[in-house]
């Protein structure tokens, strides 16, 4: 580097040269490397930054924050939320000196004492084998009306009920809800029913009824109604006696598969046909 003093430059000129150079470099550094603050700011920091950064030399327009940009109405927004039915159980009032029971969270009478011998005989009676049905996948079931008839014989019409304990949980393809079975003013069982549905929101009402029926079947299992349907030895014997497994073909896709059916049924429902 050249020594400016030896070359004959006066000290005053040298000092002015360095000071002006430092000022110019500071301005260039400030314009080139200044970064914008974060998007979310408090009102105090935003106003302070605006007053500090405003200068005649800055020609770039202020940047819009993310919150100021409105989404375009032309772009469809795909919703991933579930349906909300707003069917949570109502809270019971305490105006009757505690006589009203809120069955959405109460366990009143659960396991307090057994039912009478007459009721127990009706509940534990063997299931009529001709009432049992089978699904194509081999699952045995009893129609819901059969459970209701047993409960009516045991407790009498009006002597039992199914009370919801939670709000319905709805997803894109399934609905579920927890119910409690009350018999003669006592909680006897709690179960969560579920039901798959297809076709959108308009199918929710039917799916909710199927969910309630599924919960009733699960609650009746605790009372011993049709307990044979969970006995593996009974299932094997009943299938061998009343059912058969056959090959069927899908009418449209021509795919073949095995399904179960009752021997007494000679036809196959659409869209399958016997091969």
Curated annotation (Swiss-Prot):
Extent of Low complexity compositional bias? 38-64
Q: Where in the cell is it found?
A: Mitochondrion matrix, Mitochondrion nucleoid
- For whether the record's keyword set contains Ribonucleoprotein, the answer is no
Superkingdom of origin organism: Eukaryota
Kindly list the GO molecular function terms attached to this UniProt entry.
Answer: DNA binding; single-stranded DNA binding
Q: Which residues constitute the organelle targeting sequence?
A: 1-18
Keywords linked to the UniProt accession: DNA damage, DNA repair, DNA-binding, Mitochondrion, Mitochondrion nucleoid, Transit peptide
Coarsely, its chief localization is mitochondrion
GO biological process annotations for this chain's record?
A: interstrand cross-link repair; mitochondrial genome maintenance; recombinational repair
Give Gene Ontology CC terms.
mitochondrial chromosome; mitochondrial nucleoid
**Region (Disordered) spans which residues?**
34-77
Q: Pfam families given for it?
A: Mgm101p
Query: Which InterPro entries does the entry mention?
Result: Mgm101 (IPR009446)
Q: Does the keyword Cytoplasm apply?
A: no
Family per record: Belongs to the MGM101 family.
Q: What does this protein do?
A: Performs an essential function in the repair of oxidatively damaged mtDNA that is required for the maintenance of the mitochondrial genome. Binds to DNA.
Descriptive protein name:
Mitochondrial genome maintenance protein MGM101
């Amino acid at each position: 580097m050249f020594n400016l003093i030896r070359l004959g430059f006066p000290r005053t000129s040298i000092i002015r040269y360095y000071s002006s150079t430092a000022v110019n470099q500071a301005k260039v550094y400030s314009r080139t490397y200044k970064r914008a603050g974060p998007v979310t700011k408090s009102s105090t920091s935003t106003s302070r930054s605006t007053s500090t950064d405003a200068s005649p030399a800055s020609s770039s327009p202020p940047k819009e924050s993310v919150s100021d940009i409105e989404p375009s109405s032309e772009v469809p927004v795909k919703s991933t939320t579930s349906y909300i039915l707003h069917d949570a159980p109502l809270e019971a009032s305490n105006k009757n000196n505690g006589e009203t029971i809120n069955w959405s969270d109460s366990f009143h009478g659960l396991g307090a004492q057994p039912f009478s011998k007459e009721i127990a005989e009706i509940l534990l009676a063997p299931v009529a084998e001709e009432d049992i049905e089978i699904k194509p996948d081999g699952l045995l079931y009893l129609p819901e009306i059969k459970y209701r008839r047993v409960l009516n014989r045991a407790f009498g019409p009006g002597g039992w009920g199914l009370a919801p304990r939670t709000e319905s949980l709805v997803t894109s393809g399934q609905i579920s809800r927890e119910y409690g079975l009350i018999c003669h003013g006592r909680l006897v069982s709690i179960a969560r029913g579920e039901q798959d549905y297809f076709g959108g929101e308009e199918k929710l009402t039917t799916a909710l009824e199927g969910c309630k029926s599924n919960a009733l079947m699960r609650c009746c299992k605790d009372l011993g109604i049709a307990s044979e349907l969970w006995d593996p030895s009974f299932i094997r014997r009943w299938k061998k006696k009343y059912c058969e497994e056959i090959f069927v073909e899908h009418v449209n896709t021509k795919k073949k598969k095995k399904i179960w059916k009752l021997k007494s049924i000679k036809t196959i429902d659409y869209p399958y046909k016997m091969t």
